[in-house]
Amino acid sequence: MSVSSSNLINKAVEHLSRFPGVGKKSALRMALFLLKRTEGDTIELSEALLNMRTQIQYCDQCFNLSDGPLCNVCNSPSKDTTIVCIVKDFQDVIAIENTGQYNGLFHVLGGLISPVDGIGPSDVKIPELLSRVQEKDIKEAVIALSSTLEGDTTEYYIAKKLRDLGVRVSTLSKGIAVGGELEYADEITLARSIKNRVIIDN
């Protein structure tokens, strides 16, 4: 359905409305806002989006999104390199970093173990995690995965493997809703879960 008498605006609205949580009305407001900006502003925006899409890569060490071989977290001299937080996706890195309660490194799995879907440990970045732990002086691993069947399965598998390597393993304290994703948890709840993380003994 057309929202404007202009086909050019309708085309822009069609693309903008594909963003998560953006409906046709919000997309139209965005399009009209851009029309009121200078041509230079619009060009800068389009260039920023294109550069993001073509130049972003995965960190060689933790598989977070990065502008270069190593991401800003791995490159930071202020980070505690003896602790690594294991997350599903890069959105979780952002959520945990924003709490200000964690000062270690990360490891992004890029997925979760799901036998039903045919996804095993080797299909996500678990082998890379185990190699990294053996090569680096990692003393603690914080498993920060969603409270879902897949998340719990992945946590159990990783915890056993890491404990066998002599690594202290902890998980977020309860507070994130069962079935909930970390990126949608409020910062206070997530910060409390990190600060009060629980050691996994078995």
Task: Please give the residue ranges for each predicted region.
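Long C-terminal interaction/binding lobes of large macromolecular proteins
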Residues: 130-202
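Extended interfacial segments that mediate partner engagement and assembly in macromolecular machines
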Residues: 27, 76-144
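Cys/His-rich Zn2+-binding cysteine-cluster or related metal-binding knuckle/ribbon modules and their
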Residues: 3-9, 18, 30-93
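Catalytic cores of large soluble enzymes that bind and process phosphate-bearing ligands
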Residues: 4, 37, 41, 117-121, ...
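Solvent-exposed alpha-helical segments within well-ordered globular domains of core cellular machineries
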Residues: 10-14, 28-32, 43, 47, ...
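Conserved, well-folded catalytic cores of nucleic-acid-processing
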Residues: 15, 19, 37, 52-55, ...
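Core recognition of P-loop NTPase motor domains used across DNA-transaction enzymes
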Residues: 11, 41, 46-49, 60, ...
